[in-house]
Amino acid sequence: MLAGARRLGLPRGGHLCWLLCAFTLKLCEAEAPVREEKLSVSTSTSPCWLVEEFVVTEECAPCSNFQIKSTPECGSTGYMEKITCSPSKRNEFRSCRSALMERHLFWKFEGTVVAVALVFACLVIIRQRQLDRKALEKVRKQIESI
């Protein structure tokens, strides 16, 4: 390359970085409207535990196969708890997250992170060996030319 010339564009791997950033932003934009819709539910049709004080009557327990298919509260997590609202004395169910499920999801996440780290560590080692071979080849050619 000439002394005054400079390289235009992104360095190697820069395109991949920008592509990853754009993809992540698209995912965030796709999830945002769903959250807004959930928050905009009117209070007249909302469950009593959103607007009143409540007492948990039955702790978080796994749903049966029938409940998962028939009860919307069971659909999202597979667990639900029974709640009694104090002022209106209404009994309702709400979805909940169990400690066992959270632990399982945590270890699944940790396993995925370790696996990805190992893959990238192997890629780094392979790339480093390639670069070392190229450097040794250049040095060998320089020594041979003397």
From Swiss-Prot:
InterPro entries: JTB
Localization annotation: Membrane; Mitochondrion; Cytoplasm; Cytoplasm, Cytoskeleton, Microtubule organizing center, Centrosome
Sequence intervals crossing the membrane: 106-126
GO terms classed as biological process: mitotic cell cycle; mitotic cytokinesis; positive regulation of protein kinase activity
Signal peptide: 1-30
Cytoplasmic domain ranges by topology: 127-146
Pfam families membership: JTB
GO MF, any single term: protein kinase binding
UniProt entry tagged with the keyword Ubl conjugation: no
Membrane topology: Single-pass type I membrane protein
Any one annotated GO CC term: centrosome
Family: Belongs to the JTB family.
Role, per record: Required for normal cytokinesis during mitosis. Plays a role in the regulation of cell proliferation. May be a component of the chromosomal passenger complex (CPC), a complex that acts as a key regulator of mitosis. The CPC complex has essential functions at the centromere in ensuring correct chromosome alignment and segregation and is required for chromatin-induced microtubule stabilization and spindle assembly.
Name of the featured protein: Protein JTB
